[in-house]
Amino acid sequence: MPNLFVIAGPNGAGKTTYVRDFLPQEMRCREFVNADLIAAGLSPFAAEKASFEAGRIMLRRLRDLAARREDFSFETTLSGRAYAPLFRELRAAGYFIQLDFLWIPHLDITRNRVRQRVTKGGHNIPDDVQLRRFHLGVRNLAELYRPLLDHWRLFDNTGDHPHLVAQEKSGTIEIVDVPHLAIIEQSASVRFVSDSPAITAEEAPAFTPDEVTRRSLRAMRRAYARVVLENKAWGLPVIQWRDGIGVVEVPPEQLEPFARRILEVDGDPLPADEERALLSHLKI
């Protein structure tokens, strides 16, 4: 069965960074299509003006890959509804569709991350576009795309350790982090479990991640640590969210120990050879 991996989330959520670790290393998928990168190629100094043409090129490329029944992936904010017909076509053709949504709790995080990306030579997304897209993605996941997916997962990608909030596979939903899901539902004015009472934290079952989820979280940690170390090399802070505080900046001089904390798994450090390779990979 061929696979489609969709990586979704607001601008600045870390989608492309996650993809670079997750797809080739953990899922052995080499085909990745990104409309923002296409737009940047069409118009390097004003990529937003090429977004419509980039979207057309992207959809054409996706259908070409599907016609060859290849495994492939693409990135999206999921703020539009145009992918629904494509998902229906692919499921009818026998594709297994998995979507990972990387959630960000506050628009200020995305704005600051996009500004940093521009500083490092990446593409810009205008503030008004970020604002329009911010809540639409998770709302469309809950209200439009859920029944078109075989497996979706909702991750919080802002704290020291990215973690799974909820997932649904083959129609069975599993809520892993009840308080975070409640925050997401309230902020986006949406319900993922609309036909049953809200689950309390005490009622949530114990969660044991499967192998694919462990791979995803491992890739997210590696990807986040890379960004942290890249920011250190550029002399930039890391923008993140801390419960009870809000948006905070971790200054450059604190970023190497911060990267080490990210790589720890339940208090266990990354194997020494992997840590050395990661901590020494940036030469700017």
Locate the predicted segments by residue.
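NTP-dependent small-molecule kinase module
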Residues: 143-195
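Conserved substrate/cofactor phosphate-moiety recognition/catalytic segment
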Residues: 17-70
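N-terminus-biased detector of the onset of the functional/mature region
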Residues: 195-284
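Short hydrophobic/aromatic beta-strand immediately N-terminal to the Walker A/P-loop
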Residues: 5-6
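Glycine-rich phosphate-binding loop used to anchor ATP phosphates in small-molecule kinases
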Residues: 50-104, 134-137, 153
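P-loop (Walker A) phosphate-binding loop of NTP-binding proteins
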Residues: 10
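Conserved glycine(s) of the Walker
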Residues: 14
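A glycine- and Lys/Arg-enriched "phosphate-lid" helix/loop adjacent to the NTP-binding pocket
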Residues: 95-144, 195
